[in-house]
Amino acid sequence: MSLVFNLVKRLQLILLSLVVGGLAVAFLSNPAAAETYIVKMGSDKAQLVYDPPSLTINQGDTVQWVNNKVYPHNVVFDKVPGGDAALAAKLSHKALLTAPKQVVESAFVDVPPGEYTYYCTPHRGAGMVGKIIVNG
C-alpha cells in the first residue's frame, strides 16, 4: 500500500513540475516585438513622395509618417483588404500637417494581412501615393 502511495506522490510531483515548467516557458518566452517604421512625407530632395513608397510590415507593427518637406501633407487610406471603409477611416489621418517634423501614426493591430494603399490629398495628382503590405 505504501509503495502505491509513494508512486502516486511521485507522479503528482512530476506532473506538477511539468506544468510549472511549461507555464514558465510560456510566460518567459519573448514573442516577436512589434516594430515602428518611419515614412517621410516629402523626400529629402523636396519631391512630392512618401519615402519609402512601399513598406512591408507585420501585424502589430506601427507606421509613423513624418512631415519632411514641401508640406502640407496627410495620409488617407483608400484601399484596404476586404474594402473595409471603417478600417480605412481608422488608419487615415485626413488633417493636413503644416509644419516640419509633425508626426501621425497608425498601429496595424488586429488588421487583416494584405495591401493597404494611401495617398496625400493635396498631392495625389502629383503621384504622392504609398503602399503598406501587412504580413499575416
Curated annotation (Swiss-Prot):
Signal sequence interval, chain numbering: 1-34
Residues binding Cu cation, per UniProt: 73, 120, 123, 128
Pfam families for the chain: Copper-bind
Topology term for the membrane: Peripheral membrane protein
Highest taxon in the source lineage: Bacteria
Stretches assigned to the Plastocyanin-like domain: 35-136
Swiss-Prot/TrEMBL cofactor(s): Cu(2+)
PROSITE patterns: COPPER_BLUE
GO MF entry, a single one: electron transfer activity
GO cellular component terms attached to this protein's record: plasma membrane-derived thylakoid membrane
Localization per record: Cellular thylakoid membrane
Cited InterPro entries: BlueCu_1, BlueCu_1_BS, Copper_blue_Plastocyanin, Cupredoxin, Plastocyanin, Plastocyanin_cyanobac
Keywords: Copper, Electron transport, Membrane, Metal-binding, Signal, Thylakoid, Transport
Major subcellular site: membrane
Annotated TM spans: none
HAMAP family linked: Cytb6_f_plastocyanin
Listed PANTHER family: PLASTOCYANIN MAJOR ISOFORM, CHLOROPLASTIC-RELATED
Family: Belongs to the plastocyanin family.
Task of the protein: Participates in electron transfer between P700 and the cytochrome b6-f complex in photosystem I.
Full protein name: Plastocyanin
Gene name per UniProt: petE
